[in-house]
From Swiss-Prot:
Location (main, coarse): cytoplasm
GO CC annotations, alphabetized: cytoplasm; nucleoid
Gene3D superfamilies: Transcriptional regulator MraZ domain
GO biological process, one term: negative regulation of DNA-templated transcription initiation
Protein name as it appears in the record: Transcriptional regulator MraZ
HAMAP family for the chain: MraZ
Subunit-level organization: Forms oligomers.
GO terms assigned for molecular function: DNA-binding transcription factor activity; transcription cis-regulatory region binding
Organism (species): Enterococcus hirae
Keyword check for DNA-binding: yes
PROSITE patterns named in the record: SPOVT_ABRB
Family: Belongs to the MraZ family.
Superkingdom of origin organism: Bacteria
Length: 143
């Protein structure tokens, strides 16, 4: 399970060190793709396979399902850690998530998320302001 918040930098070649606390669970190879809310999602290969099964079961006749699957898969890329524990984030993904230099990597249960630091700060502030109300709404999901 992934959890925690880690601050890292992306170098001029688009490389970022994956936090050591997340590396073992993530594995040497994993999939990185567009996420929601303007961040990137990173999945261990096993989790990606589980997600693939669910995505492939989506109804092809539904336009939203087709759009989501296309957008999600078209940016997906297999990443491999180098000897220094870094990954190279493709420019298309860096542009999507507005990643320049300072970023935040967070663990979110079965995946990691990579955020531009300013975007994460803004998201966190809004989430903190509304956390009690959001928590109350989670009752509908059995929490």
């Amino acid at each position: 399970m992934f959890m925690g918040e880690f601050r890292h930098n992306i170098d001029t070649k688009g490389r970022m060190i994956v936090p050591s606390k997340l590396r073992e669970e993530l594995g040497e190879q994993f999939v990185l793709t567009r996420g929601l809310d303007g961040c990137l999602f990173g999945y261990p290969m096993k989790e990606w396979a589980n997600l693939e099964t669910k995505l492939n079961d989506m109804p092809l006749a539904k336009k939203d399902a087709r759009t989501f699957v296309r957008f999600f898969y078209s940016a997906a890329t297999e990443c491999e850690l180098d000897k220094q524990g870094r990954i190279n984030i493709p420019s298309t993904l860096r542009n999507y998530a507005a990643l320049t230099k300072e970023c935040v990597v967070i663990g979110v249960s079965n995946r990691i998320e990579i955020w531009d630091e300013a975007r994460w700060q803004e998201f966190s502030e809004v989430a903190a302001e509304n956390f009690d109300e959001i928590a109350e709404n989670m009752i509908d999901f059995g929490l």
